[in-house]
Amino acid sequence: MMVRLDQMNSEEFQKYLSFAIKYFADEQIKSGNWKLEEAISKATVEYEKLLPEGQDTENNHLFTIRDGSKEVGMIWLAQITNEKGFIYGLNIWEGNQGKGYGKKTMQEIEVLAKKFGLKSIGLHVFAHNNIARDLYEKLGYKEKNIKMEKTL
């Protein structure tokens, strides 16, 4: 496996954005945060705030993950301050999951983050996403906050 991170072009970004809005909306519904009828519009607003200039939004680095010429996923790293980064998205496309692409991508993004001068990287993972939580813990990411809620 030879993982390479290539800056997204506009076509790849549009494909990612369509996927990401739906995925984020679905995850918010699963978590009990949003209702079905409002989820897509709320997710769209969030992405418009985070990426007002699309893939050209300053301090945001959106990459297509490739294994050779094959597209296997995407990762989005935002530079929050001069020293802190935040991964807003890591998605390995269906059919490519469970093959080590997530782990290798995280290792590659850490190399790039250091080149950008970052000293730390944060990320968010939904509590129900045990596969992602396990991966991040194995890579040395530590929980900093835990939000808990009870539905009545």
Question: Where are the language model's segments positioned?
Answer:
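Conserved GNAT acetyl-CoA-binding A-motif
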Residues: 106, 114-124
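Active-site acidic-Proline motif in GNAT/NAT acetyltransferases
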Residues: 93-95, 99, 127-128
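Conserved acetyl-CoA pyrophosphate-binding loop and the N-cap/start of the following alpha-helix
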Residues: 96, 100-108
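Conserved active-site alpha-helix within GNAT-family acetyltransferase domains
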Residues: 103, 127-145, 150
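Extreme N-terminal starter segment of soluble prokaryotic enzymes
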Residues: 2-3
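Acetyl-CoA-dependent GNAT
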Residues: 7-88, 93-95, 112, 146-152
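Short glycine-rich hinge loops at helix-strand junctions in the catalytic core
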Residues: 100, 117, 140
